[in-house]
Amino acid sequence: MIKIKKGLNLPIAGRPEQVIYDGPAITEVALLGEEYVGMRPSMKIKEGEAVKKGQVLFEDKKNPGVVFTAPASGKIAAIHRGEKRVLQSVVIAVEGNDEIEFERYVPEALAKLSSEEVRRNLIQSGLWTALRTRPFSKIPAVDAEPFAIFVNAMDTNPLAADPTVIIKEAAEDFKRGLLVLSRLTERKIHVCKAAGADVPSENAANIETHEFGGPHPAGLSGTHIHFIEPVGANKTVWTINYQDVIAIGRLFVTGRLNTERVVALGGLQVNKPRLLRTVLGAKVSQLTAGELVDADNRVISGSVLNGAIAQGAHDYLGRYHNQISVIEEGRGKELFGWVAPQPDKYSITRTTLGHFLKNKLFKFTTAVNGGDRAMVPIGTYERVMPLDILPTLLLRDLIVGDTDSAQALGCLELDEEDLALCSFVCPGKYEYGPLLRKVLETIEKEG
């Protein structure tokens, strides 16, 4: 087992009950274009057109052959675009049960599939988009070969679902999905799970299981990659989430695209935090209707540390998100708040009384408790960064955009989620995720 000591389990109230309930009926789903790094769509549909589940909606111009398929049948209700006509979302008004069927195999045949058969079915169904590269976190080219594939079967994000609860319901599909992935490449398939977690596996020669323990970010793919198969400019691995592995297992046996998702609905602003069964791209405002405390709330698709605000054209469950988090907007001001002992506020430093209340769960809001200021290296980054890098120096390079030094310090190993804790504990109130993405884009273009 690999156990990390540095990190932080955010003591946030509103943790979900680890029992799966059926979610409300969803009448709108969407694909969010901005989730896919570097993607430029070539649209295959238009507004008002009827589509089947599994039908191609658009293709990536920059990555030919990579197609994005409809998560449900219905009519194209809207195609939202932002500045410079960047695709924000393709919205489908759900109607009927029409779907496209893909190749299917008897379970006994999965162990004999060729790499070409696996690749073809994943690409045609749109499940190829479940794979992401590291470095750069992009969808891999259709003819690319990874050094390894990392299956993330654990989650240490605040208010997250326990993957073992979800995998237990679909154990056979999960095992079949692993078997299919083992036929995609001869390289290692690394299945990463929490210490002692009951996660099934397959006996294929190239499948290895690893256990990780310790605080967040022990459950992030970036942590797993760093300790097992570090990447670099000339070494690429792929990552995939456990729910997508289940979907792959079902696709190859049934020939039908499975877009079911189990998400954690959590936060103190939720009346009954729990796990909900829904669909990929579900409209978040429909999922949370009647579920929230009547207040000024911020609804987030994903983790409170690294999720996206779910509203307007982005009011849909993200492709790579397994939770919906709800916290109160922190718009109010406190008179002499910095002088008070503040037992109800958490701090990683000793600036509040809440720091010393080790077993207390706190009500977090969106307030950042201060304005923008200079980056202050007081050791907080080192306390939450378990990777063998120098976080203060790396973060400084991200701020000034020094790509050469950032590469030397290990930025190619990282994704936005890997720096979310650094943003949380930063005295200077910097958001390091967007800074990292800007540097990675520059490196990819200019080297």
Curated annotation (Swiss-Prot):
One of its GO terms (biological process) is sodium ion transport. Keywords: Ion transport, NAD, Sodium, Sodium transport, Translocase, Transport, Ubiquinone. It is an enzyme of class 7 (translocase). It catalyses: a ubiquinone + n Na(+)(in) + NADH + H(+) = a ubiquinol + n Na(+)(out) + NAD(+). It comes from the Bacteria. The keyword Translocase applies. Its EC number is 7.2.1.1. InterPro entries: NqrA, NQRA_2nd, NqrA_C_domain, NQRA_N. Pfam families: NQRA_2nd, NQRA_N, NQRA_SLBB. GO terms for molecular function: oxidoreductase activity, acting on NAD(P)H, quinone or similar compound as acceptor. HAMAP family: NqrA. Composed of six subunits; NqrA, NqrB, NqrC, NqrD, NqrE and NqrF. NQR complex catalyzes the reduction of ubiquinone-1 to ubiquinol by two successive reactions, coupled with the transport of Na(+) ions from the cytoplasm to the periplasm. NqrA to NqrE are probably involved in the second step, the conversion of ubisemiquinone to ubiquinol. Belongs to the NqrA family. This is Na(+)-translocating NADH-quinone reductase subunit A. It comes from Neisseria gonorrhoeae (strain NCCP11945). The gene is nqrA.
